[in-house]
């Protein structure tokens, strides 16, 4: 089976978020299971790659009345489509806070170029796997423009970002005009790239079973709940995984003291070192938030509860960047048990995972979430809101589980969950048992990869 994995970002070549990690992980593990897989992504100015080989493959497209030539480079595991006018820029999607105005041409053009390269046999595939709005038009182009027999799988990582563009985009990127209607890519007078992937792919996946259900509701569907209900027969929820070779406290070179499930008590040495470094009391529970400071991650809930949290017998560490980072920095100046680091620092993040007693994720919505999985891999007991993948990965201790969960995103329920966590910590035997359980859970890429292989086999069996 030959799989072409299409993504706007693949680690280590380009990364702005979890899509890059997912792409890297799935490609790596598909190879492990004998699948002939290769990634394909844009050749960005910021691309982190060496020794790429320029191939004799390529395609020229007319986009918005102008010709663009895409040259094809390759590494061992990935193709890169190069057009410096479109992708030779300082940012992948645009400066912080906004996207480039021609992102429809950039990613619509990329999707059409990939599709034409497949249709002409320059890129080989039995199954094409597209991801999120940036590559969502590939199933449409393959089926409606190039009429290829290649099967397609489309993964929704976050429905909140759909790739919405004006009606003129139809002509600008070469979408057949007859597809601009509500049963295809039209969405309230706009072109919706994500909708194109949903309608024209052979199978849709999303990143957790609960999120697959949630996106069919008005609360989480962002206007696409109707079309997702219509195509629910081809929708699957597959829980994301993390690479246990990359995230491994037994071999992590960044942390103070390596440890594993067999000698997990060494984890607490990490906490002692970090507490000394940060000037906090090691005997108090350490609750950490390692994520973006954005609305989705429930940060308003934290900020609204800051005064009450300052009175709890616990220390809180926040690591991340985003629109609320100044608000967090301001709070940290008021309350001594709040430590805030407004940066993306992988080395420090790993130290924090290894040192923390609890990992905090009060997200308003969470398609899957990797932070809680990494935290549990490192022995952090999760405190999460029951939504999306958080619901699928964390079982409350009151129900025979190992974590702390809450349902309503209110001050009362959130503070109650923090108090329950502190009570758990103060019961040393019960707390250490939870640590042992979370470290023994399997959220590896192995499980996820097997499910995707089943999806590929399913679409190949379709006539």
Curated annotation (Swiss-Prot):
What PANTHER family does this protein map onto? ALPHA AMYLASE DOMAIN-CONTAINING PROTEIN (PTHR45825:SF11), GRANULE-BOUND STARCH SYNTHASE 1, CHLOROPLASTIC/AMYLOPLASTIC (PTHR45825)
| EC number in record | 2.4.1.21
InterPro entries per the record? Glyco_trans_1, GS/SS, Starch_synth_cat_dom
Q: Which residues bind ADP-alpha-D-glucose?
A: 15
Under the GO molecular function aspect, what terms does this record hold? alpha-1,4-glucan glucosyltransferase (ADP-glucose donor) activity; alpha-1,4-glucan glucosyltransferase (UDP-glucose donor) activity
Per UniProt, the keywords (alphabetical) are: Glycogen biosynthesis, Glycosyltransferase, Transferase
Instruction: From the UniProt record, give the pathway where this protein acts.
Output: Glycan biosynthesis; glycogen biosynthesis
The coding gene here is glgA
Q: Name the CDD domains for this protein.
A: GT5_Glycogen_synthase_DULL1-like (cd03791)
Q: Which organism is it from?
A: Aquifex aeolicus (strain VF5)
GO terms under biological process: glycogen biosynthetic process
| Superkingdom in the source lineage | Bacteria
Catalytic activity, reaction form: [(1->4)-alpha-D-glucosyl](n) + ADP-alpha-D-glucose = [(1->4)-alpha-D-glucosyl](n+1) + ADP + H(+)
Would you tell me the protein name for this molecule? Glycogen synthase
Tell me yes or no: is Transferase among this UniProt entry's keywords: yes
């Amino acid at each position: 089976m030959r799989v072409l994995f299409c993504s706007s970002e693949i680690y280590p070549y380009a990364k702005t978020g979890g899509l890059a990690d997912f792409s890297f992980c799935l490609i790596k593990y598909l190879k492990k299971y004998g699948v002939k897989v290769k990634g394909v992504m844009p050749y960005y100015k910021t691309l982190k790659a060496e020794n790429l080989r320029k191939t004799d493959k390529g395609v020229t497209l007319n986009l918005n009345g102008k010709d663009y030539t895409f040259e094809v480079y390759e590494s061992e595991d990935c193709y890169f489509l190069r057009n410096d006018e479109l992708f030779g820029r300082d940012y992948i999607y645009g400066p912080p806070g906004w996207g480039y105005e021609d992102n429809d041409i950039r990613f619509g053009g990329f999707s059409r170029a990939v599709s034409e390269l497949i249709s002409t046999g320059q890129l080989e595939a039995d199954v094409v796997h597209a991801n999120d709005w940036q590559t969502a038009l590939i199933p449409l182009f393959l089926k409606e423009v190039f009429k290829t027999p290649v099967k397609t799988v489309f993964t929704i990582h976050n429905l909140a970002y759909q790739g919405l563009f004006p009606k003129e985009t139809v002509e600008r990127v070469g979408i057949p005009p007859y597809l601009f209607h509500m049963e295809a890519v039209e969405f309230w007078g706009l072109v919706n790239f994500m909708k194109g992937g949903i309608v024209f792919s052979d199978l849709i996946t999303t990143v957790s079973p609960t999120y697959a259900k949630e996106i069919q509701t008005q609360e989480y569907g962002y206007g696409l709940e109707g079309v997702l209900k219509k195509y629910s027969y081809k929708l699957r929820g597959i829980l994301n995984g993390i690479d246990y070779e990359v995230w491994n406290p037994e071999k992590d070179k960044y942390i103070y003291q390596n440890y594993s499930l067999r000698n997990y008590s060494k984890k607490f040495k990490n906490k002692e070192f970090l507490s000394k470094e940060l000037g906090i009391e090691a005997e108090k529970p350490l609750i950490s938030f390692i994520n973006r400071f954005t609305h989705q991650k429930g940060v308003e809930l934290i900020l609204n509860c800051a005064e009450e949290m300052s009175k709890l017998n616990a220390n809180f560490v926040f690591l991340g960047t985003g629109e609320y980072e100044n608000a967090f920095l301001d709070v940290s100046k008021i309350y001594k048990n709040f430590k805030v680091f407004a940066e993306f620092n992988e080395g420090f993040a790993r130290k924090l995972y290894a040192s923390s007693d609890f990992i905090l994720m009060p997200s308003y919505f969470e398609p899957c979430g990797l932070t809680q999985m990494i935290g549990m891999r490192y022995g952090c007991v999760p405190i999460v809101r029951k939504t999306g993948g958080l619901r699928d990965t964390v079982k409350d201790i009151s129900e025979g589980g190992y974590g702390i969960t809450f349902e309503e995103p209110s001050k009362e329920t959130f503070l109650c969950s923090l108090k329950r966590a502190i009570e758990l910590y103060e019961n040393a035997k019960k707390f250490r048992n939870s640590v042992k359980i979370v470290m023994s859970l399997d959220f590896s890429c192995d499980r996820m990869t097997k499910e995707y292989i089943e999806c590929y086999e399913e679409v190949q069996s379709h006539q």
